[in-house]
Amino acid sequence: MLSAQLDEYLAEMNLSATEQQKKQLIGFVEMLNKWNKAYNLTSIRDPQQMLIRHIMDSLAVSPHLVGERFIDVGTGPGLPGIPLAIMNPDKTFVLLDSLGKRIRFQKQVQHELGIKNISSVESRVEAYQPETKFDGVLSRAFASIEDMLHWCHHLPTDDGCYYALKGQLAEDEMEKLPEEFEVTDVIELKVPRLDEQRHLLRVIKK
């Protein structure tokens, strides 16, 4: 059932995936559903809704990623980082979260599904000092873009980019950005079977 739905949704989004990638995406949903019963990793309980709201919602960002090295801040159970890593084996992703149970889940996913291009780090963002900075800083965890830029300012390279995943856009939010930052793109994301607004904002330092 999930497999047929995944094929349908990927086709609607014009995304191509190998059989191995599809198997990993479905495996991730199945593991999330299983672990969620004990660890409360997401408020979504239905695997079909997980596929839409977590997997496809994450994958909508995939065509817009530029660079090779990314960090997903406040990743929770690995969203959007794990689905993006599965679909982009040529890129590397650091998954950052401060809760140990989420990191344990991510490491189990990495082990069981054989995902080679992710590394999970248990840390608060302000305490995390990477040896190498990132081409892209991703997050759907922050309440505002202003907060994201404040807490993640030390993570991107000089020409790196922030990718803020948002629902409905608040116009005043972009007006509150510090003057040294610029929103280069506001992309409306289309997620199959999700009748809610989704946007990706790309922000750079001037």
Curated annotation (Swiss-Prot):
Transmembrane segments: none annotated. GO terms for cellular component: cytosol. InterPro entries: rRNA_ssu_MeTfrase_G, SAM-dependent_MTases_sf. The gene is rsmG. This is Ribosomal RNA small subunit methyltransferase G. Specifically methylates the N7 position of guanine in position 527 of 16S rRNA. The keyword Signal does not apply. It is found in: Cytoplasm. It holds the Pfam family GidB. PANTHER family: S-ADENOSYL-L-METHIONINE-DEPENDENT METHYLTRANSFERASES SUPERFAMILY PROTEIN. Belongs to the methyltransferase superfamily. RNA methyltransferase RsmG family. It catalyses: guanosine(527) in 16S rRNA + S-adenosyl-L-methionine = N(7)-methylguanosine(527) in 16S rRNA + S-adenosyl-L-homocysteine. It comes from Shewanella sediminis (strain HAW-EB3). One of its GO terms (molecular function) is rRNA (guanine-N7-)-methyltransferase activity. Keywords: Cytoplasm, Methyltransferase, rRNA processing, S-adenosyl-L-methionine, Transferase. Its EC number is 2.1.1.170. S-adenosyl-L-methionine binds at residues 74, 79, 125-126, 140.
